[in-house]
């Protein structure tokens, strides 16, 4: 049997008074998801193990069945893989947002919806004027710092010999909060450090890494304020992309491919606009399919993603489709948009995939070949909180001939009564691979 996972990032939520105590999933018009839940089996899944941040890098890796205690190295290395940066043993790669600060507070984690073409100009500017800053070079050595352009506001910072034992604060978890108390700090892990270590690019201590990152943050604000892009934004009274914000870093991970973990998977593909998910896919040995017009926002090319998934299922036996839009709506606190993204996912992506799977000869060429569909979010991104929440998420599993349970619609409340009950982490993939 072939398998497709369709993941609506941050799609789950909490009850909202404005919706008479319903969640966006309960309120949204999503007949295909409800049909799959009614005809399939449902449950809830713990996607964030104790002690880990409730981020997409954690939850999506766990959903694919990996042991986070063995493979987790943060977002940075995964996004490096997607961008095509080959990490060395001494590299420390960390996600680097370009964000908006106003009046001493974090206003947006996305630099005022910074576009990739503008971001590329700013990243080049930072490489020329910040990575080569005389004070940085004098203190930490030449070639220590490199910025790498990603997509929109999501970029990468690589520090040769950086130390991962630091405490960072994701900017999307702290909207409207003062930024200075959120600067990087070291974990309480230290070791002796000397000039010879610096010259051979051995690892900095946690304290030195934190100090370097904080210095880069402060200097970036001075530089970005002077850039013509932000000066024009200021004239128009628009939000500026006026600070870098590094978070979630690590070293090069060691991961088995999905095919090594699950022998029944012979080949697979991942479809996502997000570097992080593409990076997980690369380490998992999945083929990366990039869809034109896939933005990671509500205006993404749902139909293009659906068609790409249908084509992938003709040749691969595992497809992972990730849609970011509902997460961004949650971070923006936009209830109406979050509901729309759920409905778009249902009608513009899941519906055509379901119709292709159930159409005779469209995907499956023989009567004994079937496709199993799973739908779930990775975590909650409640619109009233605007941050990630690591509570259990609802999931459904459907295929022709599955024995349905009593769940009648797909949402956080209904799936509590699903026949799978409450699963933990890798148990989801185990359940999926039973078919």
Describe each region flagged by the PLM.
Residues 1-435:
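Feature captures the catalytic ectodomains and active-site-proximal regions of enzymes
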């Amino acid at each position: 049997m072939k398998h497709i996972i369709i993941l609506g990032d941050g799609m789950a939520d909490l009850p909202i008074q404005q919706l008479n105590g319903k969640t966006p999933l309960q309120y949204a018009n999503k007949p295909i998801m409800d049909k799959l839940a009614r005809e399939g089996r449902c449950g809830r899944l713990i996607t964030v193990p104790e002690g880990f941040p409730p981020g997409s890098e954690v939850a999506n890796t766990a959903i694919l069945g990996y042991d986070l205690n063995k493979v987790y190295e943060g977002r940075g290395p995964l996004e490096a893989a997607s961008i095509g940066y080959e990490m060395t043993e001494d590299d420390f790669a960390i996600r680097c947002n370009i964000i908006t600060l106003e009046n001493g507070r974090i206003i947006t984690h996305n630099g005022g919806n910074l576009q990739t073409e503008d971001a590329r100009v700013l990243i080049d500017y930072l490489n020329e004027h910040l990575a080569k800053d005389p004070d940085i070079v004098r203190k930490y050595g030449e070639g220590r710092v490199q910025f790498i352009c990603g997509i929109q506001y999501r970029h990468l910072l690589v520090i040769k010999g950086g130390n991962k034992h630091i405490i960072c604060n994701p900017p999307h978890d702290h909207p409207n909060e003062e930024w200075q108390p959120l600067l990087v700090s070291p974990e309480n892990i230290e070791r002796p450090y000397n000039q010879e270590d610096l010259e051979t690019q051995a690892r900095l201590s946690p304290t030195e890494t934190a100090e370097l990152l904080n210095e880069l943050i402060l200097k970036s604000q001075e530089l970005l304020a002077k850039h013509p892009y932000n000066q024009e934004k200021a004239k128009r009274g628009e939000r500026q992309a006026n600070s870098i914000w590094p978070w979630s870093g690590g070293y090069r991970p060691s991961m088995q491919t999905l095919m090594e973990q699950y022998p029944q998977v012979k080949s697979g593909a991942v479809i996502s606009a997000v570097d992080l998910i593409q990076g997980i896919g690369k380490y998992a040995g999945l083929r990366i399919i990039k869809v034109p017009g896939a933005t990671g926002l509500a205006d993404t090319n749902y139909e293009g993603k659906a068609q790409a998934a249908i084509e992938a299922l003709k040749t691969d036996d595992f497809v992972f489709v990730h849609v970011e839009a509902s997460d961004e709506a949650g971070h923006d606190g936009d209830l109406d948009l979050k509901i729309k993204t759920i409905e778009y996912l249902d009608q513009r992506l899941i519906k055509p995939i379901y119709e292709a799977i159930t159409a005779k000869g469209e995907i499956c060429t023989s009567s004994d070949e079937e496709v199993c569909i799973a739908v779930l979010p990775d975590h909650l991104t409640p619109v009233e909180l605007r941050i990630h929440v690591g509570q259990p998420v609802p999931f459904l599993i459907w295929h022709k001939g599955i024995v349905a349970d009593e769940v009648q619609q797909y949402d956080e409340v209904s799936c509590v009564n699903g026949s799978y009950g409450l699963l933990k982490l890798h148990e989801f993939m185990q359940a999926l691979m039973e078919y």
